[in-house]
A protein has these predicted regions:
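Short gly/pro/ser/thr-enriched loop/turn and capping motifs at secondary-structure boundaries
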Residues: 41-43, 106-108, 123-125
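Hydrophobic alpha-helical interaction segments
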Residues: 120-161
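Short capping loops/turns at secondary-structure boundaries
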Residues: 98, 112, 130-133
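A short alpha->loop->secondary-structure connector
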Residues: 107, 111-117
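Glycine-centered flexibility sites
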Residues: 21, 83, 118-121, 130
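Active-site-proximal, substrate-binding regions of enzyme catalytic domains
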Residues: 2-96, 103, 114, 141, ...
Length: 161
């Protein structure tokens, strides 16, 4: 059973988990993952990612929503990319938690009152709920590092404590 019914996600976590073939981990965190059209476009630049993501969309486990281009979006685009901006606005509008890993985007989301979590935070919750062992976490973090997802030794140590 997932820990959340529905969450919004930015692209980094999705791309990283698709690249290490562990996307299904997210469904332990949330039953349904909503993404913006811009995030869908960012994730689907690789054919294998598009195929996998489209499968989850067909199964209604991932949903794509269009975010209106308005003044609020334009203001966010001054500081963030389109995917992050749309994700933040979608999370704010739907009053749902946002999975976002970029520090700058997370800070802006928090300023706007959006509850955020990153991939490492999700792994920490999985550890506390005994959904992942230390060895599984080390395996996942090593795989993430191999696809250029940055995890410091200090953060890994904290995750394993």
């Amino acid at each position: 059973m997932a820990l959340n019914e529905v969450v919004i996600s930015d692209s980094t976590t999705l791309i990283s988990l698709l690249n290490i073939e562990r996307f299904e981990l997210l469904f332990n965190f949330s039953t349904i993952i909503i993404i913006s059209q811009a995030v869908y476009n960012e994730v689907c630049y690789q054919p294998h990612a598009k195929t996998t993501l489209d499968g989850y969309i067909a199964d209604e486990r991932v949903s794509v929503k269009v975010v209106k281009n308005n003044e609020r979006l334009q203001q966010l685009l001054i500081r963030l990319d389109l995917g992050e901006s749309e994700s933040i606005l979608l999370a704010k509008k739907e009053n749902l938690p946002l999975i976002i890993d970029e520090k700058k985007g997370r800070g802006i989301a928090v300023e706007l009152g959006v509850k955020t979590i990153g991939l490492i935070g999700i792994l920490l919750i999985f550890k506390k709920k005994s959904l992942l062992s230390d060895n599984e976490i080390i395996e996942i973090v090593d795989a993430l590092r191999n696809v250029d997802f940055r995890v410091s030794e200090a953060l890994l140590k904290f995750l394993l404590e």
